[in-house]
């Protein structure tokens, strides 16, 4: 698996495996990465996060290995603590993930991703389309659509501006 991931990376594509199916997309462009950086810079603890002990530890673009074997690489993963893994895919389930839509990969980010993440136990899934300014916020109990800029309160006690 690691060899396949390395070869994909060298070829200039990001490889993910969801439910046994390989999904790929081109490496992100400047606009995409600027949005990721802007969102990450806004992530803060709320009072709930303080009382719950959530550190709002956020990491961009790392592999997450889910219990059923899928391998995803969210644009931003938010955890309540620093994951243990440093040199391999992280196995701790993120509290929240944020995806920034890449042109041509809207279906992957807006339709496949949210359903998958929620099934795996991620509590908040936020998807931002920088071309339309759509902000999709999905939870087990509901889905909302908003227009950027918007402040999102996450269940874990973190907040971000998308």
Language model regions located:
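Gly/Pro/Ser/Thr-rich low-complexity, intrinsically disordered segments predominantly at protein N-termini
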Residues: 1-162
């Amino acid at each position: 698996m690691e060899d396949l991931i390395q070869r994909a990376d060298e070829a200039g594509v990001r490889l993910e495996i969801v439910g046994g199916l390989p999904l790929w997309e081109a490496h992100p462009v400047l606009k995409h990465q600027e949005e990721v950086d802007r969102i990450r810079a806004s992530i803060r603890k709320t009072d709930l996060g303080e009382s719950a002990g959530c550190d709002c530890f956020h990491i961009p673009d790392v592999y997450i290995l889910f219990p059923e074997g899928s391998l995803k690489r969210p644009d931003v993963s938010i955890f309540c603590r620093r994951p243990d893994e440093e040199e391999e895919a992280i196995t701790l389930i993120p509290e929240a993930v944020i995806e920034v839509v890449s042109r041509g990969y809207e279906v992957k980010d807006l339709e496949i991703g949210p359903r998958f993440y929620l099934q795996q136990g991620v509590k908040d899934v936020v998807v931002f389309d920088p071309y339309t300014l759509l902000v999709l916020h999905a939870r087990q109990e509901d889905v909302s659509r908003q227009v950027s800029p918007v402040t999102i309160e996450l269940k874990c006690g973190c907040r971000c501006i998308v």
